[in-house]
Structures are given as C-alpha cells and as structure tokens.
Swiss-Prot record:
Cleaved signal peptide residues: none
GO molecular function, one term: structural constituent of ribosome
Stated name of the protein: Large ribosomal subunit protein bL28
Gene: rpmB
Keyword list, A-Z: Ribonucleoprotein, Ribosomal protein
Length: 78
C-alpha cells in the first residue's frame, strides 16, 4: 500500500537531516496518513480511506459525500 493520501494526493518528499555541524544526510518526510472509516449516509455503508490529517480537515469542510464524488470522478475505486 503506497503512502499517498487519497484526498489530497500528498506523498513522501525528500530532504536532509542537518546535524549541529551542518552535515547533510538524506531523509524522507512522510505524510501523516491515517486509515479512517467514514459513514456514507446515501449508501448506508462505511468507506475506508487512507487520508492525511489535512485530508480529514477537507472532508470536515466539504463533506464526505462531495469528496467521494470527486474521488469517483477521478476514477478511484471507493
């Protein structure tokens, strides 16, 4: 399972760790992904999405029905 948010599309990015001596070593910054079940009232069932916490805020703002409709329009299976 890839580390990609289904709502926002956030994915891991790369950068550097910096020590006190300013030595750079490569590292990955991972998105804060959560597996979360959302209740779809129109379909009377739960859908499980892998979303970042930013994605959860978007769902709170727009509503799960709108977000699921956008996912289906993009061709994602929900």
């Amino acid at each position: 399972m890839s580390r990609v948010c289904q709502v926002t599309g956030k994915r891991p990015m790369v950068g550097n760790n910096r020590s006190h001596a300013k030595n750079a070593t490569r590292r990955r910054f991972l998105p804060n992904l959560q597996n979360h079940r959302f209740w779809l009232e129109t379909e009377k069932r739960f859908v499980q999405l892998r979303v970042s916490t930013k994605g959860m805020r978007i769902i709170d703002k727009k509503g799960i029905e709108v977000v699921v409709a956008e996912l289906r329009a993009r061709g994602e299976k929900v």
